[in-house]
Amino acid sequence: MISQFRRLYYFIFLSWTRVNGDDIKFTGNFMLASGLKISYISQDTSYLKGNLSEFAYNNKMDETLFKTILRKLDFNREQFDKNMEDFSAGQKKKVLIAKSLCESAHLYIWDEPLNYIDIFSRIQIEKMILEYCPTLLFVEHDDAFCNNICTKNINLCL
């Protein structure tokens, strides 16, 4: 196991961002241990197509577990056969959260996971995180959610 973490992959990030109309250049290094599995949720849900069974199959997920998590997130069974293109933004975000929770990963990275999510589902997501205790790095603006599940909180201000 130790030798696994001695082999690192390096990624260099160089990007630009705008803050108050000013371009800000930033760089950094990211080291990834060989064999490390990461589950990532992006803010973008526009690529979700087809129905949930197809999505589970294409992503090599346990369909029963996937749909069970979606039921905990207040999905009705009738939604299981609908096309994801017709889902609301909140329903699409729930699909990505359920997908991530179905994945066996060393690190879960979620970019604003609670965007468009209703209060009931926020509570359910919080309960699942507290129950399964994944190693989770996320960006979120909901202070109550962060305070309830975080073991360490880093505030970034630009």
Each language-model region and where it sits:
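Walker B catalytic motif
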Residues: N83, I109-P113, I117-F120, I125
